[in-house]
Amino acid sequence: MATIEVRTSAPEKARSLLRQALGREQRLLHDAVIRTHARAEELAAKTRVDLDALRAGLAPHPEEQDMELLELEGELELLDRIEDELRILETLEICP
């Protein structure tokens, strides 16, 4: 695991601020995951597409659903990115 060094004249205060900021960012990302997942599920139900099949590239793309499916694919990509960021944040450790 890599180490990131922060230099400050107020280490205790900086440590506290960093912990608060990381916690706040984790909560925001967690909420974003919930909202984005709900939106993806809503679009999947509307288009009657299986999310696993869509992710695997196996779902048909009827022309009349093209825009909805593009939106759904965008939501799934966004969900993946948000989940990746959240996983990274959850591995961060602030050392004394």
PLM segments and residue spans:
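Amphipathic alpha-helical coiled-coil segments
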Residues: 22-36, 40-43, 72-75, 79-82, ...
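Short, glycine/alanine-rich amphipathic alpha-helical segment
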Residues: 56-77
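Short acidic DE-rich linear segments
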Residues: 93-96
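Short hydrophobic/aromatic segments of transmembrane alpha-helices and their interfaces
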Residues: 10-11, 37, 52
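Alpha-helix initiation/capping motif
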Residues: 10-11, 28, 62, 66
